[in-house]
């Protein structure tokens, strides 16, 4: 029998569509009695829901201001630029922050840690989401815009791993040190279901490439 059983569902709120398919099917196969609900939320909403006990755990990028919550490291994920063939940056082998400006970028709306980290890394004091980008609203949509010949967006390492050969031709690395985020499992410090957390951490770490489990010398956490 499974070592984890619960009469109530465990809510794991996460914001990474590229991570869930990697570990969730295997988790359910190994622990069929485990009841987990997964919902997408913005980082600040995750923090509030954890503090109120509305949810059990969240998978987020580690950020300042989370000291009152328990952070369990999962892996490190590098950012890449996704550049349209018609953009001047397409001919660059690597992208430097000085090459970027807010007008050519497709960015998520404010409140997404993915956007906030990259704006900080690129030192864009006045970067803002395009109104069109805001209404379209997802990383996948921005990627389709780039593929159709418009602008630049940013994608995480797990997304790059799923791209086809033609799409990978649009991927560019950043100059060293490459911007990278630490992904953590966030819980309330009073959460007592330690076995559940151990299982989640184990399965998530098994689902990503081993080289993502530690920070490389060429990477810098943003």
Predicted segments with their positions:
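Single conserved hydrophobic/aromatic residue that forms the stacking wall/gate
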Residues: 2-8
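N-terminal winged-helix
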Residues: 9-31, 35-40, 44-48, 117, ...
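Short beta-strand-centered segments that line the small-molecule binding cleft or hinge
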Residues: 22-26, 37-39, 43-83, 147-150, ...
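Short beta-strand-to-loop elements that line the ligand-binding cleft
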Residues: 35-41, 61-62, 128-138
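Short loop/turn segments at beta->alpha junctions
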Residues: 42, 96, 137-138, 156
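Beta-alpha-beta core module
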Residues: 66-73, 77-78, 92-93, 140-190
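Flexible hinge/capping segments at coil-to-helix
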Residues: 69-105
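Secondary-structure junction motif
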Residues: 104-125, 193-201, 208-218
């Amino acid at each position: 029998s499974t070592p984890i059983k619960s009469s109530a569902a465990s809510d794991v709120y996460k914001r990474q569509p590229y991570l869930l398919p990697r570990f969730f099917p295997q988790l359910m196969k190994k622990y069929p009695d485990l009841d987990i609900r997964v919902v997408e939320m913005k980082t600040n909403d995750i923090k509030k829901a954890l503090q109120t006990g509305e949810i059990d755990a969240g998978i987020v990028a580690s950020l300042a201001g989370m000291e009152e919550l328990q952070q369990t490291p999962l892996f490190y994920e590098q950012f890449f630029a996704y550049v349209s063939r018609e953009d001047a940056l397409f001919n660059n082998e690597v992208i430097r922050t000085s090459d970027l400006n807010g007008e050519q970028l497709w960015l998520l709306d404010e409140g997404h840690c993915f956007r906030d980290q990259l704006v900080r890394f690129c030192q864009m004091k006045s970067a803002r989401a395009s109104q069109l980008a805001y209404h379209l609203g997802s990383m996948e949509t921005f990627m389709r815009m780039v593929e159709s010949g418009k602008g630049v967006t940013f994608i995480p390492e797990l997304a790059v791993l799923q791209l086809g050969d033609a799409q990978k031709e649009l991927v560019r690395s950043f100059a060293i040190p490459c911007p990278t985020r630490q992904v953590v499992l966030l819980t309330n410090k009073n959460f007592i279901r330690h076995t559940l957390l151990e299982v989640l951490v184990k399965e998530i770490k098994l689902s990503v490439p081993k080289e993502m489990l530690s920070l490389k010398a060429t990477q810098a956490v943003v």
